[in-house]
Amino acid sequence: MILETITIIIYSIALVLIFMYALAQLNLLFNYLAAKKKEENGPKFNFNNSEEIPFVTIQLPVFNELYVMDRLLDNIALMDYPKDKLEIQVLDDSTDETVATTKAHVDQLKAKGLDITHITRTNRQGFKAGALKEGLEIAKGEYVAIFDADFLPEPNWLKKTIPFFKDPEIGVVQTRWGHINRDYSTLTKIQAFALDAHFTLEQVGRSSKGHFINFNGTAGVWRKDCILDAGNWEGDTLTEDLDLSYRAQ
């Protein structure tokens, strides 16, 4: 009898929690639909006025990414942004031949006039967060864009994201992820669907009402001062992106 009562209580609590979660998701859906109807009419940077264009640093934290580094670097080199207002940091913590091949590729891009630097460390203290933190110490940009090695941003990515920072209240802009291998298998289709729901409904729904959102670790751009004001990157957590996001808010 006691066991039966306990089971019913646990089951009832689970149902209540599921119902509350469903209501929260429904609220995000309504927020998303409302936000979708609004036109983006906020202030924009004038990219025809060089004095108004802000300096941007792109950080590429990598670790043993030998098979995607050439693709990544060639893609980033195509970024459509004034070259005198852009620097690229390759934060290479690799322990294999990635270091040598990446350095050679970086040297080639640098010879073509790209402001790109290959940065290595004698230790991996703080892992990804540690690499981002050390790169930030010498970053020249007022804004810092971050991409993992398997991301391929469109050439106009910076021109579509940086203008949001004309609003001084904006500290970070997170963009949605695309999927190169969406149709590879049933599993990748499910993963792509889940990520699309997160970015489309959850992130937009939260942001539209001023609720907490989180930086997803890549494909986003930070105001440098926002990172510093929040206490900078911390390497003592497995989710440095979520940790910084909540401290910043």
What are these regions (language model features)?
Residues 60-62, 92, 147:
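Short beta-strand/turn micro-motifs composed of small residues
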Residues 238-244:
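Acidic donor-binding loop at a coil-to-helix junction in glycosyltransferase catalytic cores
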Residues 66, 96-97, 126, 151-153, ...:
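A short, conserved beta-strand element in the Rossmann-like catalytic core
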Residues 1-52, 203:
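N-terminal membrane-anchoring/stem segments of glycan-assembly enzymes
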Residues 28-85:
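N-terminal signal-anchor transmembrane helix
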Residues 94, 148-152, 236:
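The conserved acidic donor/metal-binding loop of glycosyltransferases
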Residues 106-143, 155-238, 249:
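Long helical/loop segments within the catalytic core of UDP-sugar-dependent glycosyltransferases
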Residues 74-120, 124:
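Acidic donor-binding segment of Leloir-type glycosyltransferases
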